[in-house]
Swiss-Prot record:
Residues 1-30 are annotated as: Disordered. It comes from Octopus vulgaris (Common octopus). GO terms for molecular function: DNA binding. It comes from the Eukaryota. This is Sperm protamine P5.
Length: 30
């Protein structure tokens, strides 16, 4: 099970600089 949790570089981790996604603000209603 631990091996499946590894997502590699596309994982959801908050580390270092933030990347702005285009068109993702609509999900928050902004």
């Amino acid at each position: 099970y631990r091996r499946r949790r590894r997502r590699g570089r596309r994982g959801r981790r908050r580390r270092g600089r933030r990347r702005r996604s285009r068109g993702r603000r609509r999900a928050h209603g902004g």
